[in-house]
Amino acid sequence: MIKQALLSVSDKTGIVDFARELNALGVTLLSTGGTAKLLAEAGLPVTEVADYTGFPEMLDGRVKTLHPKVHGGILARRDLPEHMAALAEHNIPTIDLLVVNLYPFQQTVAKDDCTLPDAIENIDIGGPTMLRSAAKNHRDVTVIVDPADYAVVLGEMRANGNSVGYDTNFRLATKVFAHTAQYDGAITNYLTSLGADKSHQARSAYPQTLNLAFEKVQEMRYGENPHQSAAFYRDLKAFDGALANYVQLQGKELSYNNIADADAAWECVKSFDAANSAACVIIKHANPCGVAVGANALEAYDKAFKTDSTSAFGGIIAFNVELDEAAAQAVAKQFVEVLIAPSFSAAARNVFAAKQNVRLLEIPLGKGVNQYDLKRVGGGLLVQGPDARNVQPSELRVVTRRHPTPKEMDDLMFAWRVAKFVKSNAIVFCGNGMTLGVGAGQMSRVDSARIASIKAQNAGLTLAGSAVASDAFFPFRDGLDVVVDAGATCVIQPGGSMRDDEVIAAADERGIAMVLTGTRHFRH
């Protein structure tokens, strides 16, 4: 039964209303510093911890709650007579509810003008200590670190005579340990990122000790293959527009492969500006098999589907605009696993109401990217920054005698945008705002070029006058000859080969335009 609560929070969201409800339930309120002042100004009866312990705050507030009268009241097991006798001997009442959140360390170090002393002063000591004490003794103490849990605790107290059930206390305790682990991890990440001069501005993006925090969204029936177990975890700092922020409107539970492919589709389609045109991306095995832009979702889908209607079967489809009824009716004619869009019209939802196995994911558009790109290797972890480099037309270097026409330049930029999301070695034929042939994942670039041209031929699409993007340089002229023989009139590639001069000379010999980006987009 909760008789006494200690409240000490940095995030004061909802704390006054919560304390008012506790007071109405007859709970004695203890508090510290700014929280105590806020509660007193709201007219609530509150006792300062310094008055409660008989020991004043000291060292500029560094020592406030580090006192036996606080921690004894939290840690004492109510089922052990010797613990309760010790409390009675030293006149220590129990503290049955602890509400604490911590100094804003991560927000502090995110500021450009932060200094090491600023960071150090925002390392909370008393807060984590109390939280861990309460979480350890969760059988007897309710502990709250998140304002979102205020309503849950109040509901149980009202229903159970000021008591909170063990299951809730256990859940709240695990939340505390996750929170303090993340907090300490953030401190370690920051401190071990500082160089010899301890400069905040010169800190490394890659700390000596890397702590990452994720929370489980779901366990899955299996992983990439049926014999593998799997789960999906969400980054606690997931950026705006991240796949992990999806809302599933209908459909079966997402599988491991669904999520992997959906992420590839969503990241690719987000790279197209919805303010300029609707875009549609169709993904199969993490590779785009059709990408297009159009005046609306239907036009974009029709063009993307034409690239490779065979591979689109059972694929993942993403749009960067609302999916309306017309596009939904076209998509519904095919077998699709997952549909992703910023929103779905009511009419589009009705189209898929009869196809409840189709998974509809709604995700708000956003420009953010993951802080790190991670890849596990045996006994280790490869960590890199995201491939977020977007080349602008003004940055391209024309290296051939013939310059691209304005239309060719548009096609080249489209092709380059798509090639970034195709597994290496990647060759992409494009024209008129759509992919025409995609060659992905081959060990030699010339084979990717051949496959891309064959795919276009199989789809009945002409490559005459098309633009080609290569995610990395052409090591020899053979790949270039393949795409020109197929009908390409312009090529975009990073450059950087020892044989660049030979490849450029071949382009001039064949009468095509070639531009270099200076940026490679390997994707493995």
UniProtKB/Swiss-Prot annotation:
UniProt record, GO biological process: 'de novo' IMP biosynthetic process
InterPro entries with a match to the protein in the record: AICAR_Tfase_dup_dom_sf (IPR024051), Cytidine_deaminase-like (IPR016193), MGS-like_dom (IPR011607), MGS-like_dom_sf (IPR036914), PurH-like (IPR002695)
Pathway: Purine metabolism; IMP biosynthesis via de novo pathway; 5-formamido-1-(5-phospho-D-ribosyl)imidazole-4-carboxamide from 5-amino-1-(5-phospho-D-ribosyl)imidazole-4-carboxamide (10-formyl THF route): step 1/1; Purine metabolism; IMP biosynthesis via de novo pathway; IMP from 5-formamido-1-(5-phospho-D-ribosyl)imidazole-4-carboxamide: step 1/1
GO CC annotations, alphabetized: cytosol
MGS-like domain span: 1-145
Cited SMART domains: AICARFT_IMPCHas, MGS
Keyword Metal-binding: no
Keywords tagged on the record: Hydrolase, Multifunctional enzyme, Purine biosynthesis, Transferase
GO molecular function: IMP cyclohydrolase activity; phosphoribosylaminoimidazolecarboxamide formyltransferase activity
Enzyme Commission number(s): 2.1.2.3, 3.5.4.10
Reactions mediated catalytically: (6R)-10-formyltetrahydrofolate + 5-amino-1-(5-phospho-beta-D-ribosyl)imidazole-4-carboxamide = 5-formamido-1-(5-phospho-D-ribosyl)imidazole-4-carboxamide + (6S)-5,6,7,8-tetrahydrofolate; IMP + H2O = 5-formamido-1-(5-phospho-D-ribosyl)imidazole-4-carboxamide
Similarity remark: Belongs to the PurH family.
Entry remark concerning the domains of this protein: The IMP cyclohydrolase activity resides in the N-terminal region.
Protein name per UniProt: Bifunctional purine biosynthesis protein PurH
Encoding gene (name): purH
